[in-house]
Amino acid sequence: MDKDIRLVEQIATFKRLPKGDDRWRVAFYYIAKEFWDLEEVFVIIDKTLYEEQGLKIPVFREYKEAQGFQIFSSYNKAYKFVEKQGELFVTENDKKLIGRIRKGAFHEVFVPFFAEQKFNYLLNEEEGLFADTFERLLAVMEADEEYIVDEEQEQYLK
């Protein structure tokens, strides 16, 4: 819960930066770090694939100009999203199609696979929405002192 609150705060900070402000790199790094460090994330399962084939594949959706897999930083956020959507993500026997991905599976399987496929993610929604690529998330988290984009970034990471 504490990490989720910090993540929301980081996203809010990022959204307040004026266009052209170079601090976006730092803000992005902290969002990516908080997201990466969550013990588990939650996805909404595609109802059609679940009912017809029994597959638990995260739903791919659009939000304004962004398209990606919908991911939530807490179960409560995923639950509220499903509730607002009515029957779109609820089965006939009233099962809410919310899946959980634990940290290990997220790091070792989910992110690398979707980064390779060049997919995006939509984190949370509405005012807390943050959209980016799995590829960039993975690159930031694999970064170390040998992987510096420029001197300014190097100063931020120290």
Predicted regions and their residues:
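An interfacial alpha-helical scaffold signature
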Residues: 1-158
